[in-house]
Each structure stands twice: as structure tokens, then as C-alpha cells.
């Protein structure tokens, strides 16, 4: 399993605009083969939001980024002024996972 993170530096005062954009998103990724989950993390002490997507494998993620659904989901990008810096994109392979035991 892999986790793809996209850290987005949101300009001060534009947090609501950023969050509303995700509330109204097209919800197309959920139907992609290999997709597991999406998480959007609000910062507590910084201005970087983090969008995490979990995938069965890198090939599934790459297929998403090359799909017509991806293009549709990203066609109404927010205005550049909503961001105060470049985004930081990373991909990680999960090598260990733990959850609370029932």
C-alpha cells in the first residue's frame, strides 16, 4: 500500500475558501480501481494543509493521475492567491501499520 501526500500552503484568511473547495469536490477518486481512502488534514499550528490518498499500489495512483476523472476533478483549480507557497508532493510505501486492538 502507498500513501500520497500533497502539502498545500494556504494563504492566511483563505482557509475557508480552501476547505469549501474540498467540500464541493467532484468525488470521482472514490470509484478508481486501487483507491482506498482520502483524508484532508487541517493544520493546527502551521498554514500547510495535507491531502492524503491511500492506494493499493503506485500503478493505481498513476492510473488516477492519467485518467479523465482526474482531469475533471482538477479542472476548476482555485485561484493562485489562495496559496502562499508551492505545494509539496510525496509518495510513501507503508512498511508498518498498527491500530488499537479491540
PLM region spans:
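Compositionally biased, intrinsically disordered low-complexity segments
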Residues: 6, 13, 32, 97-98
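Short, surface-exposed ligand-recognition loops at beta-strand->loop->(often short) alpha-helix junctions
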Residues: 10-19
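Short amphipathic alpha-helical/adjacent loop interface patches that line ligand
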Residues: 22, 26
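Glycine-rich beta-strand-turn "strand-cap" elements at beta-sheet edges
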Residues: 2, 39-46, 75-102
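Residue-level signal for secondary-structure boundary sites
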Residues: 16, 59-61, 97
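Short, well-ordered beta-strand segments in beta-rich or mixed alpha/beta enzyme
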Residues: 2-8, 39-67
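An amphipathic, aromatic/His-enriched active-site/gating alpha helix that lines ligand/cofactor pockets
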Residues: 27-36, 54-88
Amino acid at each position: 500500500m502507498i500513501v500520497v501526500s500533497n502539502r498545500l500552503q494556504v494563504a492566511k484568511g483563505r482557509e475557508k475558501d480552501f476547505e469549501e473547495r474540498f467540500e464541493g469536490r467532484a468525488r470521482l477518486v472514490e470509484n478508481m480501481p486501487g483507491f482506498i481512502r482520502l483524508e484532508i488534514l487541517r493544520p493546527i499550528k502551521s498554514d500547510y494543509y495535507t491531502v492524503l490518498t491511500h492506494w493499493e499500489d503506485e500503478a493505481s495512483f498513476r492510473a488516477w493521475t492519467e485518467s479523465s476523472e482526474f482531469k475533471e476533478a482538477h479542472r476548476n483549480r482555485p485561484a493562485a492567491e489562495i496559496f502562499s507557497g508551492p505545494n509539496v508532493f510525496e509518495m510513501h510505501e507503508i512498511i508498518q501499520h498498527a491500530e488499537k486492538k479491540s
